[in-house]
């Protein structure tokens, strides 16, 4: 099992770990209107799925802002950001921070994303939240890039991700 750290704590990731080449599971998530939606989108060249513990964290907010900026530069790419935050909180934070071009989704109801993508934090003070991670799916829903950030307090490797999308 893969492990990540937050300050002095080490967490085992729970769920089924996906690897590059796997077909990504289509899971149910909750949007800002409290409606259930499927994760996988049709008709896009690439889908970037970015998970983070909570939009209330400063590094998490930087991650969301970075992907929000990329939406206009990469029109053939769909960007989704997923956390365990309640959709109301997600909407308030994104509205206050000008994050409006991302698909913001919550895994709070079923934890299906965390469990099916292997990024659910195990025992510790952040138990039940999502590990900071990024998946890129191709137009057939196959994982072509995966990064699980080892230290939750660090941002993903944006340069490596952008190379995959070009």
Curated annotation (Swiss-Prot):
Q: What would you give as a GO molecular function for this chain, any one?
A: thioredoxin peroxidase activity
Q: Which residues form the active site?
A: 60
InterPro entries reported in the protein's UniProt record: Redoxin, Thioredoxin-like_sf, Thioredoxin_domain, TPX, Tpx_CS, Tpx_Peroxidase_subfamily
Thioredoxin domain spans which residues? 18-166
Q: Give the catalytic activity.
A: a hydroperoxide + [thioredoxin]-dithiol = an alcohol + [thioredoxin]-disulfide + H2O
Q: What is its EC number?
A: 1.11.1.24
Please tell me which top-level EC class this enzyme sits in.
oxidoreductase
Assembly with partners or alone: Homodimer.
What is the documented function of this protein?
Answer: Thiol-specific peroxidase that catalyzes the reduction of hydrogen peroxide and organic hydroperoxides to water and alcohols, respectively. Plays a role in cell protection against oxidative stress by detoxifying peroxides.
Q: Which HAMAP family match?
A: Tpx
Q: Which family does it belong to?
A: Belongs to the peroxiredoxin family. Tpx subfamily.
Supply the name of the protein.
Answer: Thiol peroxidase
Q: Which organism is it from?
A: Helicobacter pylori (strain ATCC 700392 / 26695) (Campylobacter pylori)
Q: What is the lineage of its organism?
A: Bacteria, Pseudomonadati, Campylobacterota, Epsilonproteobacteria, Campylobacterales
């Amino acid at each position: 099992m893969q492990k990540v750290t937050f300050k002095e704590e080490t967490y085992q990731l729970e769920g089924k770990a996906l690897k590059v080449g796997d077909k990504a599971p289509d899971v149910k998530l909750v949007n800002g209107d409290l409606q259930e939606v499927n994760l996988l989108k049709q008709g896009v060249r690439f889908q970037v799925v970015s998970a983070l513990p909570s939009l209330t964290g400063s590094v998490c907010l930087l991650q969301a802002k970075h992907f929000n900026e990329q939406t206009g530069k990469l029109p053939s790419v769909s960007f989704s950001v997923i956390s365990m935050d309640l959709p109301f909180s997600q909407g308030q934070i994104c509205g206050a921070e000008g994050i409006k071009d991302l698909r913001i989704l919550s895994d709070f109801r079923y934890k299906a994303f965390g469990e099916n993508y292997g990024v659910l934090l195990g025992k510790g003070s952040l138990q039940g939240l999502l590990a900071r991670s990024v998946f890129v799916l191709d137009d057939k829903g196959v994982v072509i890039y995966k990064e699980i950030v080892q230290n939750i307090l660090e941002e993903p490797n944006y340069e490596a991700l952008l190379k995959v999308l070009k």
